[in-house]
Structure formats: structure tokens, C-alpha cells
């Protein structure tokens, strides 16, 4: 394991929120973070700019907001291997408002604008998206399927294995919780999902996992569910 941003000893007292990144850990082809905003940076490190990939977004939220001016991050297309500090430090200013270029819900659309070939086919498992919302689009996503929970755990490996191109799998732990932080699924469901996902590892180019503690009822709940998944995919310490 490579700690790109080491986990603070007082992590339970930290806030992730919209644009705080408290830790980022790297295993072979797997990245673990507290804030999903860093997923885009991980893809920039791992993926071939010229190659085509499929995309699987497993999340309680669609994360499809766009809108940051392209010129603020366009340079990443020719220089994808910037440091995580450069990536998270990118800012823009508009109408007297100053904000971060990459936040927890806009990274997908912005990376897609840089490398549309990384999103040749998109699978979602997200209760809040049916199709790419027109008011969010920078360019449309080719969403071929939005899987329900009864399909996901037992079929995720089938979908990943049966596409021609390898997958970006983008998992948020909050998928397993409701909007009040209540766990929706049993440990057996979560472990079965993770085991099936792991069985398709040879067809996964990169797996990004976000804990999103504020959406999971707190750090303890997020870490516990992450621990179930980590053990099944072989990255538990």
C-alpha cells in the first residue's frame, strides 16, 4: 500500500464535505479516499489517454454536475500526471465566488470532457439517475444501464467481464446507506457484491473507492462497511 496522502491519526475528527481530501491510499489498480473528488486524479494516473474504457458508477449520488470553466483544467489533457496537491488546489473565480475546480460531485463530467474515450459505455447503479441530466451535461454520457440493488450484487462481474473494453469502477460506500446514514443492506449482501466484483478484477483497469463519511452516518459506519469490501477484494491490512 502506498499512502499518497497518509491517513491522519485523528481522522475521526476530520470533515470531508464538498472539497476536503483527508487521505488517499493506493494499492495495485485500487485507490481509496474519503472524498470522491480525488477519483478523477486516480484515473489520470492509471489510464491510457488513447485507450477506450467502460465506466461503472456505483453510488447513491450521480456525481454528474459540471460547469467549471474548461480552461481552468484543460491543461490536464496534456499533463495528466500532476501531483494530487496540484489537482486538489485548482481553483476558479466567477461572479465574486471562488471555488475549487474539482469537488465531490463534478469530477466525472470534467474528466469526461478531457477524455471522452474513457466513458465509451457507462453503467450506473445509482437510485438518483435514470439518464444523464440535460442541465448537467458538458457532453452526454452513454448510459447503457442503471442497475437496481437486486441485480447489482449478483451481476456486477457479468457486466464487467462481458464488455470488450476494460472498466473504470467507481464505488462510493454511501451506496449501501440511505440519506439519513442508515445501512440498507446486510453484511452478506455487501460481501457478496465485493466478492463478485473481485472475480472480475482482470477486466478492471482501476477501482476507485470513496468512503464519504458524512453520507454514511459517520466515519465508524463508513470504515466498517469499507472493511467488509476491502477484505473481499484483498486489500485489508
Features from the language model and the residues they span:
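Catalytic cores of soluble, metal-dependent hydrolases
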Residues: 1-54, 68, 81-237
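Short, solvent-exposed beta-strand-terminating loops
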Residues: 52, 56-78
